[in-house]
């Protein structure tokens, strides 16, 4: 079996090097390379914002990013023999992270966009399997790199149906980025004005943002166009169960995959969406699963008292807001800490805080804190000393897998907080 590569010039944006990829979905986008089932392919990928959020990017840039260039994907890859009705098996052999990553809160975007309306940015240094940031002293995040956007191109008929249903959603007031030639790659007018944007996940996967899709995962994606036309990008160094703030630890990466082909399986078994499997943990068990925890829950009732029927999204949102309020009261003054960071006040400049009362469940040193549906994981040391600053870890729900060296609540023993189990309807 052969190995193929798509290399990119990382000093250039996709707009400057359009022959390496695309930022729209359309079956007429020509493939960058062709391979056989069983071949390995190495793809170098750009970050989700195509270089806009580098280390020197300001909050003004975060507040008004150019979404026309999101997401720059590497590909497509044409897999010979793949046809509609098949399943393409994509085995993730490796995801090699870059040394820089970032997390941003873009105003008007994210699960709690009305709760956190201001721009925010953290710059992460990535080394030896961990991410650290000067903006969050004492914080280390264990890595579990994966591709946030990975999938196949829809066929012509599905593209037309998808565009129609998304336009209907936009007409009802939903958040949709409709087809637009502005910033599109390729800029062929026959494609750019009709091609689908990359923001939502769809039948052939795409921007699924599933943290378990790192090394060792096997993706099973229904094929809808000849050759499957596989692409990937939007790499994440670490992420929770979702992108609560709209981003994870975003980065560039090098992806290595192996393709397999299951002829006729999608048609035979009625497979219409992405499926995936793993044979081992996506993270070491002590990071991937909690033992002792503190949880908040939510119900499908708005803060104004309006009852919604079977609204799992509202219930999850309420559970997350309840967790943030719990942390604000008993552990972290997140809002004050965010204001301090935005004003340029360093942690050592802040006044000492009184030690709060213990309100969590004590666990042995080395356990971790999990926050809301974003599943932030915080390995905790055992010093038990009271914090000396205000909210070192502001906006934790916006930070994927945030970790602290000592108990952020200042309790005598480390404690740990976790999101509730997924709501089932």
Predicted feature locations:
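Cysteine-centered motifs
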Residues: 409-411, 415
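Intrinsically disordered, low-complexity linker/loop segments enriched in Gly/Pro
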Residues: 94-214, 220
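Short, structured beta-strand/loop micro-motifs enriched in basic residues and often containing a Trp
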Residues: 16-26, 66-74, 196-204
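A generic structural signal for residues embedded in beta-strands
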Residues: 43, 87-90, 221
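Conserved mixed alpha/beta catalytic, RNA-binding, or beta-rich assembly cores of soluble enzyme
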Residues: 179-310
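N-terminal, Lys/Arg-enriched amphipathic/low-complexity engagement segments
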Residues: 2-65
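Short, Lys/Arg- and Gly-enriched loop/turn segments at beta-strand edges
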Residues: 48-59, 95-105, 227-237, 350-353
